[in-house]
Amino acid sequence: MEFAEAKKGKEYRIRNARLTDVDQIIKINRLALPENYPYYFFVEHLKEYEAAFFVAEVDGEVVGYIMPRIEWGFSNLKQLPTLVKKGHVVSIAVLEQYRRLGIGTALLQASMKAMKEVYNAEEVYLEVRVSNSPAINLYKKLGFKEVKVLRHYYADGEDAYLMAAPL
């Protein structure tokens, strides 16, 4: 899957991630987020969930990514305890100078589409810092709802919202 879009004079392209992208994905992860993962973690997720793992390119340079996983678990959306197949956005990041161009939205939409169409997931969820208003607003725009607060979720003690959306 691949598509290009332009906003504010910048054209970007969304495509499936490749193993050759992992070094740049790790660089983006380190620059953009306090939650960092080892090399093998990215490689394993890419190998296992390749169809829903996307990167964004500007002028041939990877500037953002979304790393998912697919799992079985209790629904975050249904009232009764129901076992469902769901997508989990493990990590999503865009380099600071490329934010507010729609790249995060495009990455999420591409991954969510693959979660549903390729992996037959019924819903998607993620964790987000309660202080990360831009991300929370983006997720709400895409249909996510705050399900619950995860107290002291992050290593620095900050709480997270668990947010979920139907696919």
From Swiss-Prot:
Record: residues binding Zn(2+): H88, E127
Domain N-acetyltransferase: 12-167
Catalyzed reaction equations: N-terminal L-alanyl-[protein] + acetyl-CoA = N-terminal N(alpha)-acetyl-L-alanyl-[protein] + CoA + H(+); N-terminal L-seryl-[protein] + acetyl-CoA = N-terminal N(alpha)-acetyl-L-seryl-[protein] + CoA + H(+); N-terminal L-methionyl-L-leucyl-[protein] + acetyl-CoA = N-terminal N(alpha)-acetyl-L-methionyl-L-leucyl-[protein] + CoA + H(+); N-terminal L-methionyl-L-glutamyl-[protein] + acetyl-CoA = N-terminal N(alpha)-acetyl-L-methionyl-L-glutamyl-[protein] + CoA + H(+)
Record's keyword terms, sorted: Acyltransferase, Cytoplasm, Metal-binding, Transferase, Zinc
Compartments, as annotated in UniProt: Cytoplasm
Domain of life of the native organism: Archaea
Coiled-coil residue windows: none
Pfam families according to UniProt: Acetyltransf_1
Positions of the record's site feature: Plays an important role in substrate specificity: E35
Chain sites annotated for binding substrate: Y37, Y154
Site, as annotated: Plays an important role in modulating multiple conformations of loop regions and contributes to protein thermostability: S75, T82
Binding locations of acetyl-CoA: I92, A93, V94, R100, L101, G102, I103, G104, T105, N132, Y139, K140, K141
Principal cellular location given in the protein's record: cytoplasm
GO CC entries: NatA complex
InterPro entries referenced in this protein's UniProt entry, alphabetically: AcTrfase_RimI/Ard1 (IPR006464), Acyl_CoA_acyltransferase (IPR016181), Ard1-like (IPR045047), GNAT_dom (IPR000182)
Molecular function via GO: metal ion binding; protein N-terminal-methionine acetyltransferase activity; protein N-terminal-serine acetyltransferase activity; protein-N-terminal amino-acid acetyltransferase activity; protein-N-terminal-alanine acetyltransferase activity
Similarity comment text for this entry: Belongs to the acetyltransferase family. ARD1 subfamily.
Described purpose of this protein according to its UniProt entry: Displays alpha (N-terminal) acetyltransferase activity. Catalyzes the covalent attachment of an acetyl moiety from acetyl-CoA to the free alpha-amino group at the N-terminus of a protein.
Name this protein carries in UniProt: N-alpha-acetyltransferase
UniProt organism field: Sulfurisphaera tokodaii (strain DSM 16993 / JCM 10545 / NBRC 100140 / 7)
